Amino acid sequence: TVKNLVEIINEQDTTYSPLSLYFIIDNKLISNQIEINSYFDTLIIKTSLDKEIKNLVIYKKALFNADQAIESDLLNILNPLINSESVWKSHALYLMAEYFFAKDQKQKSKEFFNQIANLENANPDIKLQAQKRLNRDLSE
C-alpha cells in the first residue's frame, strides 16, 4: 500500500527508500506535488546516500518539478549539481537549457548549452545534443 511505501521512505534506507519514492511516482500513487517533494527532501537531506546517488535524487526531483516550476525554484533544486563536478552536472545544465528553450528564452538557453559544450567531463550524449541545439537553433 501507499502507507507502507511512505514508511519505507521515512525509514531512510539507502536502497529501499529511493526505490519506494520512484515506485510511488511511476505508478502515480500520490498526486500531491508538495507531498512528493517532501519525500524527495527526506531522501536528499536525511538519508545517508552515496554522494552521486544523492545527486541523482536531486536531478530526479528537478525533473519531477520541471513542468510546473518557476525558474528560481528549478535553479534552487539544481544548484548543488550545477555548482559541482558531479556526473549529473551536464544533465542539470541540459535540463535548464531546455527549460529556457521551451520558454522561448533563447539567450539563457544558449548560455546553459554553451556551458555543456565547454564542460570537460560532460556526458558525451548530452554534449552532442547541446552542440546540435546550438548549431541548429541558437546560432547567430
Where are these predicted regions, by residue range?
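Soluble extracytoplasmic domains of inner/organellar membrane proteins
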Residues: 28, 39-140
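Extracytoplasmic/periplasmic/luminal assembly and interaction segments
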Residues: 1-48
